[in-house]
Design a protein with these regions (language model features):
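FAD-site-proximal beta/loop scaffold in flavoenzymes
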Residues: 153-168, 251-326
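Flexible, glycine-rich terminal cap/loop adjacent to redox cofactors
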Residues: 9-16, 20-37, 49, 53-60, ...
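Glycine-rich dinucleotide-binding loop and its adjacent helix/turn
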Residues: 48, 138-197, 225, 273-275, ...
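A Rossmann-like FAD-binding core segment of flavoenzymes
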Residues: 113, 117-125, 131, 190-289, ...
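Glycine-rich Rossmann-fold phosphate-binding loop(s) that bind the pyrophosphate
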Residues: 12-15, 36-37, 174-177, 207, ...
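Glycine-rich flavin
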Residues: 2-6, 22-29, 34-167, 195, ...
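Beta1/beta-strand and adjacent pyrophosphate-binding region of the FAD-binding site
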Residues: 2-14, 167-177
Length: 450
């Protein structure tokens, strides 16, 4: 019988890779894990965690001015320091990195801070040595897409954003997905002049259009300029500014350009071709329902398979994969996965959009409610909340739950449990609400909008 250095070796120590390593080690497997960049992956270091911290920082100005209508008066204007935010963010990320390091060490997994490449299906080159394993998991995550226009070397990506030396005065953001929208809103809240350019005719494709229209309207009212159906043709540098030309002849002069045109599976430097692991056109590793690739002892999960680029999904996949390895497979249910866009206003959703529901079901009922939030009720601020339920007519099952407004993510996370359990509209109606709260509106909507 062949002896290996490890029962299981994982390439990539992001959320999915770390969870795989820990759970496998708890089941008695000998585990190694390689990470050449930083523990915690994209989410902890250059993704959701620092993004949310920056979003929170950007919300204080509006709370400051809103407080005046509640009787607060200040003798001096608040001042914002980008450097202080960056330094404190770095400390928090270092703390989280150390937590991941401790968790792996406590589990008994061996951590190797090096790049890993395939030599054969059981052997990897990790740093300057060869490592063998009975099974190997690819959890190498994703990388920012590079735009193809002339002058793309002047562009920064979402990974670079959190290490910018100073806050720009004017920024052009390329893209219309959730990353672009979140950065646009937080920068606008911090006083930056923001313009978005998107090659598509809409932002946030795939989300419920009614909700997206509300976000787009709010962004425009806040001063964010959105250019759709257009793309950059060329960027040139002039002193401390960048001149941007578009395909439709528009021109912009900005001091920073941020590309947020999505992320692709990070598989380029793994030498997958040596073992003939099948990938899609964009480099995503192709897997079966048990996360097994075309090579029987090689598995993959998380962003690298390009199914759902969400940290909680990767964590669930990790637990499911380990169950498969130890002989008790349990599949991840990809229906009704909640998600949020930390825009201004915040947007969160679970289940089907109205557009998707109309394609899937013959008859649906739509419930919509909009109202001014209590927090802005005594001010001149137009902070309107929009809620939406999508119900199939024949069985009255709630198929979609959407919210635009303050604390949307926290509220929708709770209702995601109801949708996962197959709750009907009657169950919603029979639930007593908490008053006064935004969330109670979801259980008091009685009139069908359409």
């Amino acid at each position: 019988m062949t002896e290996y250095n490890y029962d299981l070796f994982i390439i990539g120590a992001g959320s999915g890779g770390v969870r795989t390593a820990r759970i496998a080690a708890q089941h008695g497997l000998s585990v190694g894990i390689a990470e050449q960049r930083f523990l915690g992956g994209t989410c902890v270091n250059v993704g959701c965690v620092p993004k949310k911290l920056f979003v929170l920082a950007s919300q204080f100005p509006s709370k400051y001015y809103l407080s005046e209508s509640f009787g607060w008066k200040y003798t001096t204007e608040p001042k914002f320091s980008w450097q202080v935010l960056k330094e404190n963010k770095d400390k928090e990320i270092e703390r989280l990195n150390q937590i991941y390091d401790n968790l792996l060490n406590e589990s008994g997994a061996d951590i190797m801070h090096s790049e890993a490449k395939f030599i054969d299906q059981n052997c990897l080159r990790v740093g300057n040595k060869n490592v063998t394993a009975r099974n190997i998991v690819i959890a190498s995550g994703s990388k920012s897409n590079q735009p193809s226009f002339k002058g793309n070397e002047y562009v920064i990506h979402s990974d670079d954003f959190f290490s910018m030396e100073k806050l720009p005065n004017k920024i052009l953001i390329v893209g219309g997905g959730y990353i672009a929208i979140e950065f646009a809103c937080l920068l606008n809240n911090l006083g930056v002049n923001v313009t978005i350019i998107n090659r598509s005719n809409q932002i946030l494709r795939g989300f419920d259009r009614e909700m997206v229209d509300k976000i787009s309207q709010s962004m425009t009212q806040a001063g964010i300029k959105i250019h759709l159906d257009n793309e950059i043709s060329e960027v040139s540098k002039f002193n401390d500014f960048y001149n941007v030309m578009t395909e439709k002849g528009c021109s912009f002069q900005v001091d920073k350009i941020l590309s947020a045109i999505g992320r692709s599976p990070n598989t380029e430097n793994l030498d997958l071709e040596k073992i003939k692991v099948e990938t899609s056109k964009n480099g995503a590793v192709i897997i079966n329902k048990n996360y097994q690739t075309s090579v029987n002892n090689v598995y993959a999960l998380g962003d690298v398979v390009d199914r759902f680029q969400l940290t909680p999904v990767a964590i669930h996949e990790a637990m499911s994969l380990v169950n498969c390895l130890i002989g008790s497979p349990k599949q991840v249910d990809y229906e009704n996965i909640p998600t949020a866009v930390f825009s201004t206003p915040e947007f969160a959703t679970v289940g089907l959009s109205e557009e998707s529901a109309r394609k899937r079901f013959r008859n649906i009922e739509i419930y919509v409610s909009s109202f001014k939030s209590l927090s802005s009720s005594m001010s001149k601020k137009r902070d309107e909340i929009l809620l939406k339920l999508i119900v199939t007519k024949n069985d009255q099952i709630v198929r979609g739950c959407h919210m635009v407004g303050e604390n949307a993510a926290e509220i929708i996370q709770g209702f995601a449990v109801a949708l996962k359990a197959g709750a009907t509209k009657q169950i919603f109606d029979n639930t007593v609400g908490i008053h006064p709260s935004t969330a109670e509106e979801f259980v008091t909507m009685r009139s069908i909008t359409r």
